[in-house]
């Protein structure tokens, strides 16, 4: 069983119980954990973030204290689940932060629901295929932007 210093809340959405932690007040930050993890991934940052933001850290379906049904476990399915959770909580827009597999879900959420995405932050993200990785490496290489400015 997951132990958390924060009060775990539950909502039943489409017949499945979803666990999440909600702390703080202000603009909403949605924290998405990696595969095989849960909301406790974010314990070290929830306290400091909740001083300025409303932090929502769910246990993705199939993880932690959330139900583990036969369901759609694709990144699109998880993105839809986050949209549904936020809708039930009355939240319109979020800064979505994803770690590892949660980064893939965060990117999919931002792609599917740009009107609900304030910012996207990736932490050691999964979901970046080989076709994306060289581009990210290139644009983060020192000197890339000045060289591109000279070429364009």
Model-found features: residue ranges?
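Alpha/beta-hydrolase fold catalytic core
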Residues: 1-29, 51-53, 91-92, 127
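Active-site loop/oxyanion-hole signature of alpha/beta-hydrolase fold enzymes
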Residues: 11-16, 21-23, 57-101
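Conserved HGGG/HGGXW glycine-rich cap/lid loop of the alpha/beta-hydrolase fold
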Residues: 16-65
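Glycine-rich His-Gly loop
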Residues: 31-34, 100, 125
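Conserved catalytic-core motifs of eukaryotic protein kinase domains, centered on the activation segment
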Residues: 41-43, 66-72, 131-134
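Short, hydrophobic alpha-helix immediately C-terminal to the catalytic nucleophile
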Residues: 43, 83, 107-111
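Residues at the starts of beta-strands that form the adenosine-phosphate
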Residues: 54, 93, 116-119
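Flexible "cap/lid" loop of the alpha/beta hydrolase fold
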Residues: 107-112, 117-151
């Amino acid at each position: 069983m997951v132990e958390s210093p924060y009060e775990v809340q539950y909502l039943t959405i489409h017949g499945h119980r979803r666990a999440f932690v909600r702390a703080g007040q202000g603009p909403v930050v949605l924290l998405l954990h990696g595969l095989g993890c849960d909301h406790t991934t974010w314990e070290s940052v929830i306290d400091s973030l909740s001083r300025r933001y409303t932090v929502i850290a769910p246990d993705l379906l199939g993880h932690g204290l959330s139900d583990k049904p036969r369901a759609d476990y694709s990144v699109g399915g998880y993105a839809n689940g986050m949209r549904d959770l936020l809708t039930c909580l009355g939240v319109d827009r979020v800064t979505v932060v994803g770690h590892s597999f949660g980064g893939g879900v965060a990117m999919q959420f931002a792609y599917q629901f740009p009107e609900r995405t304030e910012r996207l932050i990736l932490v050691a993200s999964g979901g970046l295929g080989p076709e994306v990785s060289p581009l990210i490496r290139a644009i983060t290489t020192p000197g890339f932007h000045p060289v591109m400015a000279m070429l364009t």
